[in-house]
């Protein structure tokens, strides 16, 4: 018999809020490169989403052009990840990153993903979770074909 769901605990992550230098530039990146939909825009904030189920998954708040960027040696968020529905979607997404000149951070050697940066230096990931029966193949060293496609 399955255990009863825990009570008084979160059920899922709702959204991530990022501080950016220029909200307009960030909206352009997250809509045209990442593919999110702009849901609401205010003077110095924007709310975007991928799923129609939620009002937004990403909130952007502008700090101005002189704001410092993320510090990879400091405490804070390392990256956020966007899950793709299929490997073909991940391939198309990867191609869009390359076409738009997005800075690629790298690829996992043991999963199907691409790590990249937004214009403010926030690190992001797009990945495809292989079906259970294919995960061992995807997780073996060299199992991620995207680095080969980027050449």
Predicted feature residues:
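Amphipathic alpha-helical segments
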Residues: 22-37, 96
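Vicinal oxygen chelate
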Residues: 1-7, 12-21, 68-151
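Alpha-helical elements of the RecA-like P-loop NTPase motor core of helicases
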Residues: 27-28, 91, 125
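Short secondary-structure junctions
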Residues: 35-41, 101-105
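Conserved N-terminal glycine/acidic-rich loop preference
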Residues: 3-10, 17, 49-51, 57-59
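Conserved short beta-strand elements that form part of the metal-binding/catalytic scaffold
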Residues: 37-74, 117, 123-130
